[in-house]
Regions:
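Cytoplasmic membrane-interface "Motif A"-like loop-to-helix N-cap segments
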Residues: 79-91, 298-309
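C-terminal ends and interior cores of transmembrane alpha-helices
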Residues: 91-109, 310-325
Length: 438
């Protein structure tokens, strides 16, 4: 039994991480294209600023769809199981991304192009909205109770890895296609995603269901309407889970998406230099995210998360000061440090939120709380930053916006109910069920 559990534990981590990597590759690819490509391809008749706002607006639509995905897949994930939902969410994201790569431009088919872009972005948003809860729970629930932070952090590694792959693909195609990048080169990274989806499906189909969920089915404690149940019984947990992400979610999309627009348009930095800096920061995240998840098992999730909140708030003004020097070395420092501060929260975040909910409503509750932050923080952030920059002509207001997000997060962290979590998991019980095979 011990050997089987260890093997499944590895498979669960790999399946969760590979899947989230592919889904975040798809999602970040859209964000990068929204900053560099879509204003020209889908909104050519707008002014430069209006085109950027319109492109970021379509990006926000995807964020708005994420709570819908969390509710739909949370319902079935708490009733049917984690594994089946993860296969479905991966297919949704993959098909949506592939079809974006086939979309004609506005010059070819008019306004219909922008409408189709929005519809496919909604499909992406629903897919990624259902993805997070299932991937985190599959990994965390196969792990030891003493290592929940570390186990739950591995699906989070899909974010820097997806960012690394998407940014790398955009940079590669930008270099290979040159002036043709805005006509057809940008499409290749979207089309390639279908191959990655095939790999992800193979991996996910070969992992067993979470032992915690199997225990829920065995004890017949599955709720008929888990989404309604968790909204009724744990509204404070949902709200604090959402608002605790303000300092992580909003600044993150400024650090990886808005910075491309700000750097190229406002500071006249090159697109390639900014993409290179993002690649370096994302590579560091492959280590820093699981490290901070592990550290949260040692010093406590709330303390680790609180340190990250303070770090992001304290770096808000130095971040733009370093960018505004236009010095390549200092710009790199700004981007790397900002994402390390983010990772201090992102590593322990999955376990922090998931542990707030019981197993029979965990997919629904954790998913809803997590994805609500996408609407109130992540989605509007580039739009708010662009509007502040347009009205003031300065980055100072954006720094204050980041500080405000940190204050909201710290307040939510202090208000977050403490839930007694068992010092054993179903996987621990399976490990103890039989002696180690000799």
């Amino acid at each position: 039994m011990t050997t089987v559990v260890k093997a499944q534990r590895r498979r669960a981590v790999i399946a969760s991480t590979v899947g989230t990597t592919i889904e975040w590759y798809d999602f970040f690819l859209y964000g990068t294209a929204a900053a560099l490509v879509f204003p020209t391809v889908f909104f050519p008749d707008q002014s430069a600023f209006a085109g950027v706002l319109a492109a970021f607006g379509t990006q926000f639509v995807g964020f708005a769809a994420r709570p819908i995905g969390a509710a739909i897949f949370g319902h079935y994930g708490d009733r049917v199981g984690r594994k089946a939902m993860l296969v479905t969410t991966l297919m949704l994201m993959g098909v949506g991304t592939f079809l974006i790569g086939l979309l004609p431009s506005t010059k070819s088919i008019g306004l219909v192009a922008a409408v189709l872009l929005v519809l496919l972005r909604i499909v992406q948003g629903i897919g990624v909205g259902g993805e997070w809860g299932g991937s985190v729970l599959l990994s965390m629930e196969w792990g030891s109770a003493r290592r929940r932070g570390f186990m739950a952090s591995w699906p989070q590694v899909g974010v820097p890895l997806g960012l690394l792959l998407s940014t790398g693909m955009v940079k590669l195609m930008s270099g290979l296609t040159g002036d043709s990048f805005l006509t057809w080169g940008w499409r290749v990274p979207f089309l390639v995603s279908i191959v990655l989806v095939g790999i992800g499906l193979y991996v996910r189909l070969n992992v067993l269901e979470s032992p915690d969920f199997e225990e829920v089915k065995k004890t017949r404690t599955v709720h008929r309407a888990p989404v309604l149940e968790v909204i009724k019984s744990q509204p404070l947990e949902i709200l604090t889970s959402a608002f605790v992400r303000m300092a992580e979610q909003a600044p993150f999309y400024l650090f990886i998406t808005f910075v491309l627009t700000y750097g190229t348009k406002q500071l006249e930095l090159t697109r390639d230099s900014l993409l290179n800096d993002t690649l370096i920061a994302a590579a560091i995240g492959l280590v820093s995210v699981p490290f901070f998840g592990f550290l949260s098992d040692v010093i406590g999730r709330r303390l680790m998360y609180g340190i990250g909140i303070v770090c992001v708030g304290a770096f808000a003004f130095p971040y733009f000061s370093l960018l505004n020097t236009k010095n390549s070395g200092l710009v790199l420092v700004a981007i790397v440090v900002s994402l390390i501060c983010h990772d201090m929260m992102y590593g322990p975040q999955a376990a922090l939120i998931a542990e707030s909910f019981g197993t029979n409503v965990r997919y629904s509750g954790a998913g809803l709380g997590y994805q609500l932050a996408s609407v109130i923080a992540g989605g509007p952030a580039p739009l708010i930053a662009a509007a502040i920059l347009k009205s003031t002509g300065s980055s100072t207001g954006i720094s204050w916006y980041i500080v405000g997000c940190a204050v909201v997060s710290m307040t939510a962290l202090l208000l977050m109910p403490r839930r007694a979590v068992s010092d054993r998991s179903a996987a621990d019980d399976l490990m103890a069920a039989e002696p180690v095979a000799r």
